[in-house]
Amino acid sequence: MNRRTLLKLLALTPLAPSAREYTQSQQPHILVVGAGLIGASIAYHLSFAGAKVTVIDKQGPASHASLGTFGWINASYAKQPQHYHSLSQQSVEAWHQLQKQLNIPVKWGGSLEWFSDEARQQKLIRQIVEQQNWGEPAGIISAAQASSLEPHVDFTGASNIAFSENDGAVDPVLATRILLQASTSMGAQLIYPSELSDTLYDGTRLVAAKTTTGRIMADKIVLATGAATDIVKKIAKIDIPQRS
């Protein structure tokens, strides 16, 4: 199973319910492994819901996959099939909410795409029509219209350019740090460098995690380790091969 297939399967499941307050007796202690953008978002939303949260990372915030990501927020034609595209649409909306909550600087300017190969260009046009049928505000514009949006780009020879107006861009490292800062302000603990090495159980109940910085009590563990799938296989016994 590759990363994109995994995301498609996740798209078939409902999104997490709205945040709710835990009572003191209910408050779980959750260990989030990985302080990248995904781990930081998980930590923020769990902290907001009232959970006790600890985040660990073997190097530091946004030091691996999140450091190299393009930062493109989109529900583009490449998000196939439709349930995966729907998940991406919800993700775009979630970024708008995060921006309001935490003042994360997101640039909402849309995106432009086109191909020099005529056959691929015709396929792009069909894909944009499909996007429109799925409720995405995307369309085909001329080179002149594209030049008005991006005057410093040479669109000579280009035609039928795809414009996805809902797309945005974010600095993933900055967004990660803002999310973690918000989490720690609500009581979350951030520890690095610290690496998960094993888990401890009382029968079938998880009670703690062994890390390179010591034992951490935990009721639940969330693995947000990006491309480092070896730890997922070791701890969760799930093999997630990666491909680029």
Identify what each model region corresponds to.
Residues 1-13:
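N-terminal secretory signal peptides and thylakoid transit peptides that target proteins
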Residues 15-26:
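A short, basic/flexible loop-to-alpha-helix module at the beginning of a structural domain
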Residues 30-54:
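N-terminal Rossmann-like FAD-binding beta1-loop-alpha1 element of flavoenzymes
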Residues 48-66:
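Glycine-rich FAD pyrophosphate-binding loop
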Residues 71-149:
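Dinucleotide-binding Rossmann-like beta1-alpha1 core, especially the glycine-rich loop
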Residues 166-212, 219:
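Helical element adjacent to the flavin cofactor pocket in flavoenzyme catalytic cores
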Residues 215-244:
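Central helical "cap/lid" subdomain
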